[in-house]
Structures are given as C-alpha cells and as structure tokens.
Amino acid sequence: IYDLYNELMEYDGGGDIVSVMRERLAARGDSALSGIRSSDISEIFLFFDYDFHNSQLSVGEINRRVEDMLALFADETENGKLYINYPMIESIRYTKYLPDRDYVRYAVSREQCRDFKRLARDFSAYGSLDHILFKDGETPTKEKYIRVKDNWEYLKRMNVCKANLLVNGVDAMPAEKSDISQQAIFERQVLLYVKPDDSVAILNSFPVFIYEYMK
C-alpha cells in the first residue's frame, strides 16, 4: 500500500487510484481490473498491517509513513479509506473463546511481533478460522451460520469498544463512528503504547470496518 501511496503522490495526490491499481495488476499478468474505470467503483477500502517490527525501518519512519497514508487514504469515495491492523491481520485470531472479556487488555511488544503469526495461533482458543469463516463450497448448517454470525458480532463489539477505550477512555460502543477514526486510533496507539512501551494494543480493523460500514 505504501508503494501505491508513492505512485499516487507522483501525481501530487491527484492520481486515479483505480488506474494505478489496474496498471500494477496488469504488470503482474493480473487482469482483475481490466476494463474497470474509476466511475465503475463508488467506494475503495484498504487494509494495512502496522508493521512496526520491520527491522529495515525505524519506528519513527514507520509512523511517518502511516501518517502520510492516513492523510491520503481518508475517504472511501476518493483515494480510498485506510484501515490498520495492530500489529497485523492475524490479530483476528488473538482471542480466547468468544466473547473474550479480557480482549480489552491484550497488547504485544515490538519484539513479540516478529513471531506474531505463531503467537496468535498458539494463543487462540480456536484451532482454525472455522468459527468465523465458511469453507469454499461449504453449505453451512443453520447452527454454524448463527455461530459465525454471533462470533462476528462479538468481534465487532470487542474491537470497537477497545478502540473507543483507546481513543476516548470509555469501554463501550461509541456514540458516533467518527469517535474512533483511524487517525485517532493511530495517534493514541503511538502515544499510549508505541512510544512509552514499544508495544501496541491488539486491534483488528475488519470488525471496526464492519461496524462503520453498517452504522
């Protein structure tokens, strides 16, 4: 996504994100966006891992890049809206049995993030993602459908409440979705976790996205 950001900035932030993405895919032999124009797409959402364990970059440089991307990717109807996973997408697995009332307290150090995929797998009460996903071609039973739906509702509430606690100091669902903007979440992560403790509060952006999109 940062490469995409750099390409758009070559046009002073005024580039066409759909055209840039189409060209990038075509260069790899992927025709998924062939024939698709900007006018065909009304909303764009981007998901990014807060890769602060990257040993090639300082934390300061990582944070500067995230700030730049959040500024550019701030509107789903324009350049797209960016959502950030802390520390990475595998945070969706970092729970005990749902609902996990201790989730609000979970954080991870920068050093632990180097092996976070294994850490999340070992920590999880679930041996796979079957509790939140259907397999390709699966016809779920009514019981599984309800279970998966309920688990996403738990994940949504857990992550949104945690984001609200992080930003506003209130462990409850926010009154407005703007109360937990991605910019505000990032700023509070840096202030409360990254700078003082070299850590991040575990937070997954997919449940937050679902909350915002459905609200």
Residues of each region from the PLM?
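RecA-like P-loop NTPase motor core
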Residues: 1-27
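C-terminal accessory helical subdomains adjacent to catalytic cores in phosphodiester-
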Residues: 2-8, 28-215
